[in-house]
Regions:
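Single conserved hydrophobic/aromatic residue that forms the stacking wall/gate
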Residues: 1-6, 11
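Short acidic loop-to-helix transition motifs that present clustered carboxylates
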Residues: 16-20, 38-46, 189
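Active-site-proximal loop->helix
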Residues: 17-30
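Conserved NAD(P)+-binding/catalytic subdomain of aldehyde/semialdehyde dehydrogenases
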Residues: 29-118
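Flexible, glycine/charged-enriched surface loops at secondary-structure junctions
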Residues: 57, 80, 117-122, 142-154, ...
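Short loop-to-beta-strand entry elements in the cores of soluble alpha/beta enzymes
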Residues: 61-63, 83-94, 107-133, 151-162, ...
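C-terminal core of ALDH-fold dehydrogenases
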Residues: 175-288
Length: 288
C-alpha cells in the first residue's frame, strides 16, 4: 500500500524483506518528505486521523483487500474515497480467431490476485472453450506456491466458461456481468468496442493484456467491480477535482427568479421557501 498525503507516504513492507528499494525511490521521486512503514487498516487509520504528528487526509484512494475496503466504507464521510472495490475480475470475449493459449494465460494472470478473483470466458468457439478448460489448470499447476494456491481456488470457485451462439450474445452477457477488466480477442474488434457499454477497463486485441493495465501501460487500474461498471467508471483525474458552484444576481433578475422560486416552492408546499422570494420582490418594488 503506497499512499500519498501531502508530502507523507505510507508504504507496506514485505515480511522478512522490508520495503522494496524501487518503492522508496519512487516515493522520493514523487516528493515524499515522510515515509511511514504502514499498510492496510493501520495506514488508513493513520492517514484519516492524522496520527504520528502528520496532517489528516481529505481523501483515501486505492485498491486493497476486504479489510481495506471495509475500512474505507466505515470512514466514508469523514474522508472522501474513490470507490468501493471488491476482488479483481477478468472477462475475455473470444471467438474462433483467438489464440487459446493467450486466453488461458490471461485468465490465470488475474486469478493469481486472490482466492476469490473471478475469471470469465465468453466464447462462440467450443474448441477454444475446451482447450482453455484443459489448459488453465496446467498453467496454474506450474506456478509458485502462493500464486498457485490463489489461482487454483479462484478458478475452482469463481471460474466460468460460457459458450455463446453469437457475437451479440457474448456482448449481452458481458454487459450483464460488467467485468472490471474486459479483453476482446475476436475478428471484429471494432464492433465489440462500439457495442459494449459496461466494464471497468477494456483491452482490445491480443496485443494487450490486463497485466499491462495493472503494471505499466498507463490506464488507471482502480476500477469498479461486482457489477458497478453498470453505473460508474474507474478512478480518473476528475476524482481529485472539487467543483464549487456560486451565484450572484442583480435586483432586476429577482423579478423573474424570485417569482419563479415562490411559485415552485408553493407547488411543493414549502411556504417558507416561497416567502424568501416574496420578500425580495417586495423590497425591490416588484410586488406590493
Amino acid at each position: 500500500l503506497l499512499c500519498l498525503v501531502g508530502s507523507e507516504m505510507c508504504i507496506r513492507d514485505r515480511p522478512g524483506i522490508g520495503v522494496h528499494p524501487a518503492i522508496v525511490y519512487t516515493a522520493d521521486l514523487c516528493g515524499a518528505d515522510v515515509i511511514m512503514n504502514l499498510g492496510g487498516v493501520q495506514a488508513i487509520a493513520a492517514m484519516t486521523y492524522g496520527l504520528f504528528g502528520n496532517a489528516p487526509a481529505d481523501m483515501l484512494v486505492g485498491p486493497g483487500n476486504q479489510f481495506v475496503a471495509e475500512s474505507k466504507r466505515i470512514l466514508f464521510g469523514k474522508v472522501g474515497i474513490d470507490l468501493f472495490a471488491g476482488p479483481t475480475e477478468i472477462a475475455v470475449i473470444a471467438d474462433e480467431t483467438a489464440d487459446p493459449e493467450l486466453v488461458a494465460f490471461d485468465l490465470v494472470g488475474q486469478a493469481e490476485h486472490g482466492y476469490n478473483s473471478p475469471a470469465w470466458l465468453f466464447t462462440t468457439s467450443k474448441k477454444l472453450a475446451d482447450y482453455v478448460m484443459q489448459r488453465v489448470p496446467e498453467l496454474i499447476a506450474d506456478l509458485p506456491d502462493l500464486p498457485r494456491e490463489n489461482s487454483g481456488a479462484a478458478w475452482r470457485d469463481y471460474g466460468e466458461v460460457i459458450l455463446c451462439d453469437t457475437d451479440e450474445e457474448m456482448a449481452k452477457i458481458s454487459d450483464e456481468y460488467a467485468p472490471e477488466h474486459l479483453e476482446i480477442q475476436t475478428k471484429n474488434l471494432q464492433w465489440f468496442h462500439d457495442r459494449l457499454k459496461n466494464y471497468g477497463s477494456l483491452f482490445i486485441g491480443e496485443e494487450t493484456t490486463v497485466a499491462y493495465g495493472d503494471k505499466c501501460s498507463g490506464t488507471n487500474h482502480i476500477l469498479p467491480t461486482k457489477g458497478a461498471g453498470k453505473y460508474t467508471g474507474g478512478l480518473f483525474v476528475g476524482k481529485f477535482i472539487k467543483t464549487l458552484s456560486f451565484q450572484r444576481m442583480t435586483k432586476e433578475s429577482t423579478k423573474e427568479v424570485g417569482a419563479a422560486c415562490a411559485r415552485i416552492s408553493r407547488y411543493e408546499g414549502m411556504e417558507a421557501h416561497a416567502r424568501t422570494g416574496d420578500v425580495r420582490l417586495r423590497k425591490y418594488g416588484f410586488q406590493n
